[in-house]
């Protein structure tokens, strides 16, 4: 197959950041994706309805002229979140709330330290129809970074899912066989997003031949048996798995430093890279489900009606992009050849 037409896809997990960065990140996503779930881990985090409304307005203001791209907003859960916060956020159009264990990722220091205290919040979310999005890692310093996702499932996620069977839960950016197996065996109210980097790469691509900071993300890349498990999961065509890039921009100097930031900025190449993976696996016919159907169906939103066409044509991801402030950012797969391209 040398050409494929899909219903316009959505990105069910990304980071736009804020300020001038929005002038880069919003158009990058809006070029191909109709909707995106926008992460709330700003400084300060987006913890109430007023902050959500204001952030959404800033995103809309950064859309390209004529764009009808729709940001889907989320609330940042803390141990100070109240049931009224959930009610107000739902009224403001929030579709999901995000559970970050404190310290798990960029700007998550204010996040959840006492999970059980949030159980009344989860109950209210189930009642009003708000999804729970989970960054599934434990964060105690003595626990090996490669084991944190699997431990989170056993310590926390299984308890949440069992306690709130009507709560829809998205296990975001899964990276392990344990996560894929958990999602497959859980109820229909549990699903997962998978990033392009976790399908394309494993920890060798981060550490062999030198540290490669632009492949560094959280959750960190795992060994190849886990990469293969994720690839096997999408090959099933299961509606439990769908596209979430976790596109996470950081300026070049913040990645290429003695203590570099975590995140892969994949918005400019994500759909094409997913197509490459699906094609390599001989399942290109399953790409539309993963990219365009499973996500809206799980969220209870209408599928898009417009389409996008990809052709099998090689192109090279730019080595860097200049941000509105004049600083460079290195996109994911920079300088690499990609075998699928969006038909202009």
UniProtKB/Swiss-Prot annotation:
Cofactor(s) named in the record: Zn(2+)
Sequence positions bearing N6-carboxylysine: 98
Cofactor annotation comment: Binds 2 Zn(2+) ions per subunit.
Any GO molecular function: zinc ion binding
Protein name: Dihydroorotase
Entry keyword Zinc: yes
Keywords, sorted A to Z: Hydrolase, Metal-binding, Pyrimidine biosynthesis, Zinc
Residues of the active site: 246
Pathway in which this enzyme or protein is active: Pyrimidine metabolism; UMP biosynthesis via de novo pathway; (S)-dihydroorotate from bicarbonate: step 3/3
Residues noted as binding Zn(2+) 2 in the record, renumbered to the chain: 98, 135, 173
Function: Catalyzes the reversible cyclization of carbamoyl aspartate to dihydroorotate.
Taxonomic source organism: Shewanella sediminis (strain HAW-EB3)
Complex formation: Homodimer.
Any Pfam family: Amidohydro_1
Signal peptide (residue range): none
GO biological process: 'de novo' pyrimidine nucleobase biosynthetic process; 'de novo' UMP biosynthetic process
Binding site for substrate: 15-17, 41, 135, 218, 250, 262
Membership in a protein family: Belongs to the metallo-dependent hydrolases superfamily. DHOase family. Class II DHOase subfamily.
PROSITE patterns attached to this UniProt entry: DIHYDROOROTASE_1 (PS00482), DIHYDROOROTASE_2 (PS00483)
Gene: pyrC
Entry GO CC: cytosol
Annotated residues for binding of Zn(2+) 1: 13, 15, 98, 246
Reaction(s) catalysed by this chain's protein: (S)-dihydroorotate + H2O = N-carbamoyl-L-aspartate + H(+)
Entry EC no(s): 3.5.2.3
InterPro entries noted in UniProt: Amidohydro-rel (IPR006680), DHOdimr (IPR004721), Dihydroorotase_CS (IPR002195), Metal_Hydrolase (IPR032466)
């Amino acid at each position: 197959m040398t050409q494929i037409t899909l219903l316009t896809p959505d990105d069910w997990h990304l980071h736009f950041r804020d300020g001038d960065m929005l002038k880069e990140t919003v158009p990058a996503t809006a070029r191909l994706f109709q909707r995106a779930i926008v992460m709330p881990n700003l400084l300060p985090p987006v913890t109430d309805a007023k902050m959500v409304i204001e952030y959404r307005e800033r995103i809309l203001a950064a859309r390209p002229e004529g764009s009808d791209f729709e940001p889907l907003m989320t609330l940042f859960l803390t141990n100070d979140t109240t049931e009224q916060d959930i009610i107000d956020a739902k009224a403001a159009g929030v579709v999901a709330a995000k559970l970050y264990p404190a310290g798990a990722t960029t700007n998550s220091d204010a996040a959840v330290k006492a999970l059980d205290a949030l159980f009344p919040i989860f109950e209210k979310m189930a009642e009003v129809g708000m999804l729970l999005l989970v960054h599934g890692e434990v964060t105690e310093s003595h626990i090996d970074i490669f084991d944190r996702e699997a431990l989170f499932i056993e310590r926390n996620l299984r308890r949440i899912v069992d306690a709130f069977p009507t709560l829809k839960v998205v296990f975001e950016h899964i990276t392990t066989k344990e996560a894929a197996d958990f999602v497959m065996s859980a109820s229909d109210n549990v699903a997962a997003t998978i990033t392009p980097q976790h399908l394309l790469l494993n920890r060798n691509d981060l550490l062999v031949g030198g540290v490669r900071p632009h492949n560094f993300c959280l959750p960190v890349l795992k060994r190849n048996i886990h990469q293969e498990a994720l690839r096997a999961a999408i090959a099933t065509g299961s509606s439990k798995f769908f596209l979430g890039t976790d596109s996470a921009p950081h300026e070049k100097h913040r990645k290429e430093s003695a203590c570099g930031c975590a995140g892969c900025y994949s918005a400019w190449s994500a759909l094409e890279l997913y197509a490459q993976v699906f094609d390599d696996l001989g399942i290109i016919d399953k790409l539309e489900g993963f990219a365009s159907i499973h996500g809206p169906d799980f969220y209870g939103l209408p599928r898009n009606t417009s389409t996008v066409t990809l052709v099998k044509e090689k192109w090279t991801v730019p080595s860097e992009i200049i941000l509105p402030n004049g600083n460079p950012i290195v996109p994911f797969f920079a300088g690499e050849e990609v075998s699928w391209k969006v038909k202009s």
